[in-house]
């Protein structure tokens, strides 16, 4: 079976030329469309005219690569597929040609990407395809360094060996990066000249904006090109665009400088991408087989920009269409906050299928979290919790769902956390700690009902009776959590997290934490109610899937504890606190 993958976005005018070739010929083929939130009725018309097509409707535009990844993962996970054919919405090809490409590829396992000859609507070789061709004539398989992804056949073995499109690219450049990786894996890219497909790409002039986006995509692909040395990656990905910007004149300079800055700021994400782990096929299969997903509870207040961003992050999650969403909106403290609160609520009402709970008065974050989590866990056996100032990896829900499922019966684990701000190369994924991080977390009904203790004074007294646990709660004196708990008792803060942390430590219950982080906290920009800090906790989030370890941990990871303790020692001193305060002021007034 070959999966024909099509990504549509407002492609109504193309659907007949796209799908009619399969109307009476589906032999060995399955046709699937991922629709990127079209507004012209594309998915409805496809279902009406071509009912044999499987349509996956997305609530937002994922971009070309991420949308194709949804179907590419299916081919990775299921042995019934021998490969996948990526078909642009503005392209057309016969079912017979797709089967011929698959047959040839099966006979030549050294091929990673195989394509037909791309023709335009007038029968000539399509201009973009012709750009990469050697001089004719072409006889048999013709190897190239790159072919655009309008008409790609990828054997399943290519997907298992090379992986998916990189989420670093939203639109443009993802096929160039994938071609680099295919060649790095020792596979060939090429086309068969006796097989043809049509690509109806219009030959209109390219706008300055698109030219800039293409240029940035090219430099990004070069910055992570595994075929290049580290110096060549740095030169082509960063120095070259910066130099071009400096040498340019007039109106071109500032857009090019902005492009160079964007590429520079992506370095932490590029580093994570280079360090991505091999495919966890069992984890992927678990994810695709999982039908019932736990609810997600999001807390918001008066920051429309933060709320809009996290809602967009959620829409990028592959699992979001099957995830129950509950949003808890706090009431305004004063008339000055009322407009911002209403703007936030208006954004939340637009989120597909979300249930919005609006507090009539301002209750504060701690009260809302305790009330919201407690109420939701009366009807659900687990919950994922987020706040509005978090930045999410597109695979945040993937890891959370996996860990909640695998560790449900391991009572020594009471908490999951994806905001690993103390990240380190020595830190393993799924490391267990007696530490309850609150930036992207989850728990189970039985753990919350058994362990949540609202009385901070009682928790402190129990800790003081056990000197070993008390010192552990201080992290060697580098993070004075007992002081924070005393302030909560005195009413100087209303932290729920410090009480949850203390309770888990007293009961020797573990938290399992992701690494790399899947959540970053951006609430230390001076916009929040409780926190400043100049971005000390900001981290890049994993641009690839992580999965839980099927063997549940039963004791704390001592290396992870020492890494966390050293992190507090390094960042929680007077010099660093002063530095972070200066950064916070700079961000607040000059960014």
Which residues are covered by each model-predicted region?
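A conserved acidic beta->alpha catalytic loop
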Residues: 35-44, 60, 91, 329-344
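Non-catalytic, C-terminal membrane-associated alpha-helical segments of glycosyltransferases
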Residues: 212-217, 227-288, 574-584, 588
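Short, well-formed alpha-helical segments that are part of the catalytic scaffolds
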Residues: 10-24, 303-318
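Short beta-strand-to-loop acidic/aromatic patch adjacent to the donor-nucleotide binding site
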Residues: 80-92, 380-391
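Glycine-rich, basic loop-to-helix element that forms the pyrophosphate-binding segment
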Residues: 58-78, 360-375
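Acidic/His-rich active-site region of diverse nucleotide-sugar glycosyltransferases
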Residues: 66-70, 91-163, 167-171, 176, ...
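Donor nucleotide-sugar recognition loop
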Residues: 160-191, 195-198, 207-213, 454-467, ...
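Catalytic core of nucleotide-sugar-dependent glycosyltransferases
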Residues: 194-197, 206-237, 259-268, 532-548
């Amino acid at each position: 079976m070959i999966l024909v993958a099509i990504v549509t976005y407002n492609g109504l005018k193309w659907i007949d030329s796209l799908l009619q070739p399969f109307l009476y010929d589906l032999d060995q083929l399955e046709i699937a469309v991922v629709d990127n939130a079209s507004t012209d009725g594309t998915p409805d018309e496809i279902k009406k005219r071509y009912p044999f097509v499987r349509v996956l409707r997305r609530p937002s535009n994922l971009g070309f690569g991420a949308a194709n990844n949804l179907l590419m993962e299916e081919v990775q996970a299921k042995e019934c597929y021998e490969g996948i054919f990526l078909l642009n919405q503005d392209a057309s090809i016969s079912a017979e040609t797709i089967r011929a490409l698959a047959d040839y590829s099966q006979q030549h396992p050294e091929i990673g990407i195989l394509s037909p000859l791309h023709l335009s609507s007038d029968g000539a070789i399509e201009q973009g395809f012709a750009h990469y061709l050697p001089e004719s004539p072409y006889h048999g398989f013709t190897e190239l360094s790159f072919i655009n992804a309008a008409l790609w056949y990828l054997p399943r073995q290519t997907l298992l060996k090379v992986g998916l499109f990189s989420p670093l690219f939203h639109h443009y450049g993802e096929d160039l990066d994938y071609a680099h990786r295919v060649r790095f894996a020792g596979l060939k890219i090429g086309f068969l000249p006796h097989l043809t497909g049509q690509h109806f790409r219009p030959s209109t002039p390219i706008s300055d904006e698109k030219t800039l986006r293409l240029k940035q995509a090219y430099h990004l692909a070069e910055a992570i090109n595994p075929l290049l040395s580290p110096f060549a990656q740095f030169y082509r990905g960063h120095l070259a665009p910066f130099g071009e910007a400096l040498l340019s004149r007039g109106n071109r300079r500032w857009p090019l400088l902005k492009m160079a800055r964007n590429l520079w700021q992506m370095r932490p994400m590029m580093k994570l991408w280079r360090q991505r782990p091999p495919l966890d096929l069992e984890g992927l299969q678990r994810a695709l087989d999982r039908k019932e997903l736990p609810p997600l509870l999001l807390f918001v207040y008066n920051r429309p920009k933060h709320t809009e961003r996290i809602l967009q992050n959620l829409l990028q999650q592959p699992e979001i269409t099957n995830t129950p969403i509950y949003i808890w909106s706090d009431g305004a403290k004063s008339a000055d906050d009322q407009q911002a609160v209403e703007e936030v609520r208006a954004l939340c009402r637009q989120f597909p299928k979300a249930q919005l709970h609006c507090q009539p008065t301002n209750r504060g974050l701690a009260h809302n979290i305790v009330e919201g989590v407690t109420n939701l866990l009366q009807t659900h056996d687990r919950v994922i919790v987020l706040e509005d100032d978090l930045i999410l990896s597109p695979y945040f829900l993937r890891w959370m769902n996996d860990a909640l499922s695998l560790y449900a019966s391991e009572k020594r684990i009471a908490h999951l956390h994806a905001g690993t701000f103390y990240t380190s190369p020595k830190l393993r994924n799924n490391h267990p700690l007696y530490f309850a991080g609150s930036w992207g977390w989850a728990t189970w009904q039985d753990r919350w009902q058994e362990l949540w203790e609202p009385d901070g004074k009682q928790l402190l007294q129990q800790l003081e009776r056990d000197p070993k646990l008390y010192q552990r709660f201080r992290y060697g004196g580098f993070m004075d959590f007992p002081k924070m708990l005393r302030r909560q008792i005195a009413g100087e803060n209303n932290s729920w997290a410090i009480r949850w942390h203390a309770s888990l430590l007293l009961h020797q219950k573990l938290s399992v934490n992701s690494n790399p982080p899947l959540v970053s906290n951006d609430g230390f920009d001076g916009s929040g109610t409780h926190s400043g800090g100049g971005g000390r906790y900001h981290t890049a989030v994993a641009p690839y899937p992580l999965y839980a370890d099927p063997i549940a941990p039963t004791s704390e990871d001592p290396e992870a504890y020492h890494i966390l303790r050293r992190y507090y020692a390094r960042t929680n001193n007077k010099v660093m606190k002063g530095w972070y305060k200066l950064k916070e002021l700079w961000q607040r007034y000059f960014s």
